[in-house]
A protein has these predicted regions:
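N-proximal low-complexity "stem/linker" segments adjacent to membrane-targeting elements
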Residues: 1-48
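Acidic donor-binding segment of Leloir-type glycosyltransferases
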Residues: 50-84
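Glycine-rich, basic loop-to-helix element that forms the pyrophosphate-binding segment
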Residues: 85-102
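Short beta-strand-to-loop acidic/aromatic patch adjacent to the donor-nucleotide binding site
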Residues: 105-115
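Short beta-strand-to-loop element that shapes/binds the nucleotide-sugar donor at the catalytic cleft/hinge
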Residues: 137-153
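A recurrent flexible, glycine/aromatic-enriched loop bordering the glycosyltransferase active site
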Residues: 166-186
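A short, conserved alpha-helix in the catalytic core of glycosyltransferases
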Residues: 178-179, 183-184, 190, 194, ...
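Active-site-adjacent helix/loop segment of glycosyltransferases
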Residues: 222-317
Length: 317
């Protein structure tokens, strides 16, 4: 049973960095992480948009499965560092690594199949990120056919079952329980202090939601900024919301802690309902429960709101 990380980037993986001869690392700078999913056709456009806003600390995360002309890319983009994982990693884990390498105050996370619609508006979003000091400002997004994507995510309970609902964004800096597709402007000090993404949760949907839920449980916020707009140039990613192993980890960490008198704790009777609800045998249920129990105890003073209060009062907050 993997132990839930309690510190940022706790899980060390093997990776290589290539290029970056003119890479600038300045603490007050805004860095960028370009995640790899589509082809290279949009890469020059993203780089131009980032340079237009003065971003010269850029990491491009490459897929081990994708063949690229690395020598040519290093020569053409000397201010970009190319991060090459040497083993299988989760999306969140590569973001953790990239943020630790950048060492900037703010980091823009994008995918290489996303186009930044307006660099000047992105500059406004960055200025708001600095003044608001939220965990993350996530972008408004449209499809390749210019249809608005519902990127505002609400936590909901239906007949006692937790899920999320996507609705269109209509107001600037509206809260969202997670940043759609991991994209956004992250405040790095807060991100690191909160532990980043949990590498033990391998399903991207639950990993992203785990980070977002923890953000709100611990008193911070993720909001959608209408100045920051991206366009998808390929098909939208499909979110896998199935109740898999990642869900069981998300559930015990985020939905079952009791919060009272300024701290969180796990009631032991949660074990029995957890075992029944997940269909586990006692041994397996105890292993999962113990990992969650220890993690909640370790972070008990960081919780600021009970999980179900957060959900039920979401629209009023």
């Amino acid at each position: 049973m993997s132990i839930i990380p309690t510190t940022f980037n706790e899980h060390a993986i093997s990776y290589a960095l290539a290029g970056g001869k003119n890479f600038k690392r300045e603490e007050n700078d805004v860095g960028a992480v370009i995640m790899s999913r589509g082809g290279w056709y949009n890469f020059p456009s993203i780089i131009k948009s980032l340079l237009d806003i003065g971003c010269t600390s850029i990491i491009s995360v490459e897929s081990p499965k994708k063949s690229i002309d690395l020598d040519n890319m290093i020569h053409e983009y000397p201010f970009v560092k190319f991060l090459l994982p040497q083993e299988k990693t989760t999306i969140g884990e590569t973001i953790n690594i990239s943020i630790s390498e950048l060492k900037t105050n703010y980091v823009i996370v994008l995918w290489n199949d996303q186009s930044i619609l307006d660099s000047k508006q992105l500059s406004k979003a960055i200025a708001e990120a600095k003044s608001l000091d939220k965990m993350c400002l996530s972008p408004v997004a449209i499809t390749k056919t210019n249809d608005l994507i519902s990127v505002q995510m609400l936590p909901i309970l239906k007949q006692g079952h937790f899920s999320t609902e996507a609705i269109p964004i209509i107001q600037n800096n509206t809260r969202s329980i997670y940043a759609f597709d991991f994209a956004g402007i992250y405040t790095c000090n807060t991100f690191i202090d909160f532990g980043g993404f949990d590498y033990t949760i391998t399903n991207p949907y639950w990993q992203n939601l785990d980070f977002g839920f923890r953000t709100f449980l611990w008193g911070e916020e993720i909001v959608i900024n209408t100045h920051f707009k991206v366009k998808y140039l390929s098909m939208l990613p499909v979110e896998d919301t199935s109740h898999d192993d990642s869900y069981t980890r998300f559930y015990i960490k985020n939905l079952r802690p009791t919060v009272a008198n300024g701290k969180a704790y796990m009631k032991f009777d949660v074990f029995f309902s957890y075992m029944k609800g997940m269909g586990f045998n006692p041994f397996m249920a105890y292993n999962y429960f113990k990992v969650g129990y220890d993690w909640v105890k370790k972070n008990q003073k960081r919780f600021t709101v009970p999980p179900y209060d957060l959900i039920s009062n979401w629209r009023e907050m």
